[in-house]
Amino acid sequence: MSFDVRSEKIDLIKGPELPDYNMFMSQKFTSYEGKLAILLTGNGDCSFYMWILEDAAKHEWSKKAYVVPDFFPLDPFVLLMQRANENDIVRTFHYDDRVGTSDAIVESTPASPPRHIMFSVIIRKDSPLRNLRGAKSIFKVSFTIILKTFIVKLIMMKDFQLDGDMIISKTLSRTDVDHHGRLFLPKNQVLSVLKKMRNVTKESLRKGIELEVVDIIENDSYSVILKSRNTTNDFVLASGWSIMKHSLDLQEGDDIKLFWDYLNYKFIILNFEYNLIP
């Protein structure tokens, strides 16, 4: 039903064809980008669905599906948070109007009071899970934690297992951040990563290999050139490093960690903090 304040006219709006309500734990009206929407959650497949009223006069509704990858097994989470009983934690999915955007919030909370927000991650519309960022300002959390970076760590542990042989790490020197635009890399670490790179030869390394470096926290990516130097037989990130350095605001003394995701053939920046519980 709709009510026009100016004309004081009441009209009936034909609702969308919804699936069997018994499949869902929750159905509610909400707001999506200023439009009336119906949200269904809790069908057990790590997803929820929204029907948005596009045109009240024509009774036109659009549908959006938020499919959440099942990366919340919670065993690494329970381990890191030192929770005694994994069964005390449940997954919940909801759309929260307080975000002020058309994003959806996924959170995991204890099944019984007190309800502390254990972690949350915002899922961009039309994803799934294209962008990750924290929702700390919305909730009162019961511990000191940087939510967005902790979520990234959990995903890494689940999807990539954080193989130490696939990580290149370095504390930046003055030479790394000066105007020459080169990052000198630890030789042994690069050699370890090269074992997982396809079709890499000494000749191609001398010429330079173009690689992608992804910042999954900010949803940015950079194109860099990995090269070996003939004179010293060591490795550098050459072209592209300067742009990446300035974009990330890296300074002398900062640590940079790059994880080689050999399945997707790209580096992932691991610059997150490990301070979980005081």
Swiss-Prot record:
Primary location class:
nucleus
Which of UniProt's keywords are assigned here? DNA-binding, Nucleus, Transcription, Transcription regulation
Please give the Pfam families that the UniProt record associates with this protein: FBA_3
Query: Which Gene3D superfamilies is this protein grouped with?
Result: DNA-binding pseudobarrel domain (2.40.330.10)
This protein's record includes keyword S-adenosyl-L-methionine: no
A Gene Ontology cellular component where this protein is annotated is: nucleus
- Which species expresses this protein natively? Arabidopsis thaliana (Mouse-ear cress)
Localization per record: Nucleus
GO MF annotation list: DNA binding
Q: Which residues bind DNA?
A: 168-275
Q: What is this protein called?
A: Putative B3 domain-containing protein At2g21920
